[in-house]
């Protein structure tokens, strides 16, 4: 795994671990205006893939701003595959970091995996609310 991918995974896991656990029946909140503007600017600049992104949640502290997005849910024999996007900016740094990862939800197992550089699926760091989020991800109309 490259250092860039490793640092993105660690950053995303840290952000997500800091977010409060969701209750059963979790669903994403509407995308706040500040995140709409940030995402649109990053898409327009080419830093983030220009496609429809579903806002999942965000963390805003004095040290860090991080937003989590999901796009392109597709049902597969293993569950649901999707693209995950992380927008990250640390205090004192003007530029945003954008990380996009291919992921999948293993619906029956209530867990997430990410596609590693060697095209192998590896378990994604879990949190208390992973099962609720997997249930939402797997609920494709």
What are these regions, as identified by a protein language model?
Residues 1-9:
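Bacterial N-terminal signal peptides that target proteins for export
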Residues 18-22:
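N-terminal signal peptide c-region/cleavage motif recognized by signal peptidases
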Residues 23-141:
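N-terminal secretory-pathway/extracellular module detecting exported/lumenal segments
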């Amino acid at each position: 795994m490259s250092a860039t991918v490793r640092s993105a995974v660690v950053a995303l896991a840290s952000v997500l671990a800091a977010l409060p656990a969701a209750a059963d029946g979790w669903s994403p909140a509407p995308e706040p205006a500040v995140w709409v503007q940030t995402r649109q600017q990053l898409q327009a600049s080419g830093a983030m893939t220009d496609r429809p992104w579903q806002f999942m949640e965000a963390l805003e502290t004095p040290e860090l701003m991080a937003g989590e997005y999901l796009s392109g849910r597709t049902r597969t024999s293993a569950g649901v595959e999707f693209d995950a996007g992380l927008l990250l900016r640390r205090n004192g740094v003007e530029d945003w970091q954008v990380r996009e990862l291919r992921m999948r939800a293993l619906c029956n197992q209530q867990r997430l995996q990410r596609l590693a550089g060697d095209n192998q699926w590896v378990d994604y760091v879990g949190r208390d609310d992973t099962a609720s989020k997997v249930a939402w991800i797997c609920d494709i109309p």
